[in-house]
Design a protein with these regions (language model features):
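Proteins synthesized as precursors that undergo proteolytic processing into mature forms
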Residues: 1-79
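Terminal-appendage/accessory-domain detector
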Residues: 37-38, 54, 64-113
Length: 113
């Protein structure tokens, strides 16, 4: 649960995925709050995860980004499996809306009332 500076809830979300989970939590939160993505955009966006000295990249990440990481010394690898899964609901108090997103990598849905 994320609150605004007045203590009002503005976002409820969660990301699963073992060792990816803390990275996924930050990824989604950063995408929504700092890059103004919708919950669906944030949860659906391609993921990268550094594990065992390898940047494991979902195949939707461009070759240009992969090559750029390699150029500065990172070991990179495209993977077939996905990183985590999650759901989120953003609370738009101004318009009285709940804006949900659910990860297409897993089954599930975002539901609020």
């Amino acid at each position: 649960l994320v609150e605004d500076n007045k203590g009002k809830a503005i976002l409820n979300y969660g990301v699963m995925g073992g060792q990816y989970q803390p990275v996924g939590q930050v990824h989604v939160l950063n995408s929504i709050l700092d890059f103004n993505m919708s919950p669906q955009q944030a949860i659906s966006s391609p993921r990268a995860f550094h594990f065992n000295n390898i940047y494991k990249l979902e195949k939707e990440i461009s070759k240009e980004i992969k090559d750029g990481l390699s150029k500065i010394g990172h070991n990179t690898q495209y993977i077939e499996e996905t990183h985590g899964g999650g759901q989120a609901i953003k609370i738009d108090r101004k318009n009285g809306n709940l804006i949900g997103g659910s990860d297409p990598r897993k089954d599930g849905y975002a539901e609020g009332y």
